[in-house]
Amino acid sequence: MPLKPKLLVFSHICSPQYVTGAEKVLMFMLRELQPYFTCTLVVPTEGVIAQQARAYNIPVICHDVPLVVPLYLALPHLMGEIESLQRTEAWPALIELIRREQPDVALVNTTVHPLPAIAAKMLGVPVIWSVMEAIRFTPHTANSAALIEHCADLVVGISEATLAPLRTPGLLPKSIIIPPSWNPDALHPESWPELRAIRRADLGVADHQKLVGYISASIFDAKGLDHFMQMAVEVSERFPDALFLIVGNPTDPAYFEQCLERARSRDLMGKFRWIRFEENVETIYPAMDITVIPSIEAEGFGMTALEAMVFGRPVVLYGAGGLAEIAGATGNSAYMARPGDTGGLFARVWSLLGDPARMAAAGAHNASAVQAAFGIDVYRRRIVHLVGLLAGRGVLPPSPVKGTGDTVYRFENGLLRPYRTGEALQADGFSYEQVREVSDLLIAMLPKGEPIGSLPPPKRGRRSRTAGRRRVLARARRKRGRRRPIRGIAAGRRRARRIGARHRRPRHPRRGRKTKR
């Protein structure tokens, strides 16, 4: 079988201690693309996702590529900064990397990482641009969109919010949405009750107490920790059994201390717990009773909201960007407050804490609704659609595919069209050596189109052989004077008796001869 197309994936960061939402989404997509591509990950330095990639048998290249933040911020000096970086040693080194690796496709992650896309475009390599955050709306947003339009053969957004600044006539036809998902096999739900008990014991949370959680890989002002603290202080003064958990790494220590001061000034620090980073989220979410996501700026998606719902937690959030889309898709609009409305956060959290039955029902609803909206089966159908688009646009070579069975198919407009015969495959310009083997899951999930080629001539089956045998016997009978063959011993005896009955005459005793007595 020929090799799968090579996909060179550029990650803008590789955090040494914790995984950001963008890194998590990228790694999940990379694993789901492995059935269709030979993937190689390019990271700026060693870190967590580099280790994860190697564990999944994905080669890793450490190669630092400068970021271009003005693309995301839509600043006027965007092109000037790119031209300045192209005059540094980093630019020819990037060109040489892509030339050496010779990928069939390049995937660029986030809107602060344009240099790999520009370099790949120059070398004639098709580009998939994964957009995980919403570009800022400024007078120069059109310049950012124009750069992406020029470089990208396909733009993959994780939400409507991420694609909103890119809804131009040139980008609309080549933009799709693939929201994040999760691998249910990696979460081990049977262990959640035990993990809940262990983690709550470690945090000093009793069974009768309610733990309200805030989680963000990086804590800075846009993530709204100060709004969470204001809500938490008000809740704790009215609900003595409420405790609060903060999970995340402060990237702005001054801001973090300012947030904690809200509780410290009221002598409420004993009600708060803090975990800087936890890679195994399955040990965190089960311990929470409610999860709050108070992002004050538009989120590209909102992985914490998704994860909390997967674990069956009630979620209270601000309707900022992708968070509003998650709330709408899962029927959680009642628990969505207007961004900046801390009173709205308080009212929703308070209503859940005061009604245990309602809190349990909200969690159960989330576990079911998030599966229907963002589950792994939905995600894989979208990946199949992505692969079909790439093949249809000529980004991928349209080589035929097969599963473990014998049927060979051709990708065409998101459909699998089976070849009726090997001659049909050859007439389409392919040999059997060009057929790629893919997972049976892909074959089962893709809708099937019209077969290719003419129906093969009918085969001579057992019935034809029987008819031939009868013709031979008939000829033999004609040669023997049309005598019918004797079928078996008993049949022969019966037939002999019938023949004898026709030809034998009755025997009479001879005259003059006496019978002895």
Task: Kindly label every feature range from the protein language model.
Residues 188-205:
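A short helix/loop element that forms part of the nucleotide-sugar donor recognition site in Leloir-type
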Residues 314-317:
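Short hydrophobic beta-strand element within catalytic cores of glycosyltransferases
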Residues 329-330, 334-342, 351-356:
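Conserved acidic donor-binding segment of nucleotide-sugar-dependent glycosyltransferases
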Residues 42-48, 182, 215-216, 243-258:
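Glycosyltransferase donor-sugar binding loop
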Residues 248, 257-277:
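Nucleotide-activated donor-binding/catalytic signature segment of Leloir-type glycosyltransferases, i.e.
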Residues 201, 358-373, 379:
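A short, well-ordered alpha-helix in the C-terminal region of glycosyltransferases
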Residues 20-28, 210, 219-234, 257, ...:
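A conserved mid-protein helix/loop that constitutes part of the nucleotide-sugar donor-binding site
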Residues 395-468:
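Short, surface-exposed polybasic-aromatic patches that bind anionic ligands, especially phosphate groups
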